[in-house]
């Protein structure tokens, strides 16, 4: 095959990404070939596979690609808004599937278990989000919920909403989680204050606050592990 100067329709049947997937299965395709299926077509001078290879080379890895926005993707020649939206949507579906699989498996026995559940959800976001894991008496996760979404510097949490959702889910324990997009693990004074406020309210309602995790891309800070609780 003479490289990237031919449109995919001119390639041999064995080299076309869609046909290759049908014949050999999805596992047989490279990342660039899978992305080429999403893109659908390239240009006169560049195939969809070559365009995908160029984007992947720029992103370095799939994790970095997932962080790209539509506005960033359309800067690549050959990628319009529709193609960019398709890429972003597909990557987001993959992230959600991964997060769901992890959640189904988990009984919380340590702060690391909570981190494993929440890192794929908030660990790599460019903005701050505050979430709660709702647990039963066996420390199994019943549900999870986003309480607030903010900017780079912080987010506001409604304490009443924390316990409204907790009681609706029949939870006996909660784990608070939020991310720091800056990568800074240490809690701010505001982090400590909201934790204390929620913990005090939980004692009144007989709902135990088991921990509060600050999550970044690769690490986490546990209030319990650090002796703040």
Curated annotation (Swiss-Prot):
SUPFAM superfamilies cross-referenced by the UniProt entry: RuvA domain 2-like (SSF47781)
Location of the motif JAMM motif: 178-191
Entry keywords, A to Z: Hydrolase, Metal-binding, Metalloprotease, Protease, Zinc
Location of the MPN domain: 107-229
Biological-process GO terms, alphabetical: proteolysis
CDD domains, sorted: MPN_DUF2466 (cd08071)
Ligand binding (Zn(2+)): 178, 180, 191
Molecular function terms, GO-annotated: metal ion binding; metallopeptidase activity
Keyword Metal-binding applies: yes
Keyword Metal-binding tagged: yes
One Pfam family it belongs to: RadC
Protein family according to the UniProt entry: Belongs to the UPF0758 family.
The protein, known as: UPF0758 protein Fjoh_0413
Upper lineage: Bacteria, Pseudomonadati, Bacteroidota, Flavobacteriia, Flavobacteriales
